[in-house]
């Protein structure tokens, strides 16, 4: 289903709330906008609106196995099936770094007095 909604610019906040609350489904979504601040605000307000979210691009053509893909809300569990991101649901990620040549000076070079 494709929904296109034309709105009055003075009702932008109301329109974004309508977009975010109208549907119980959220497979993909997109916004087309030219102002960076509007893009930033809209993306933030629609964080949970769709599993895949596109900015100034068509909301189709995700390649399973190459691009994480999965819906949110009634469109799925947002697991991103077909990608390694799906594994994150089943594991507890831990990053370990080992340095084989420990530094002798623990000060950051940018903190040196000139």
Language model features: what each stretch is:
Residues 1-114:
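Conserved C-terminal structural/oligomerization subdomain of aldehyde/semialdehyde dehydrogenase
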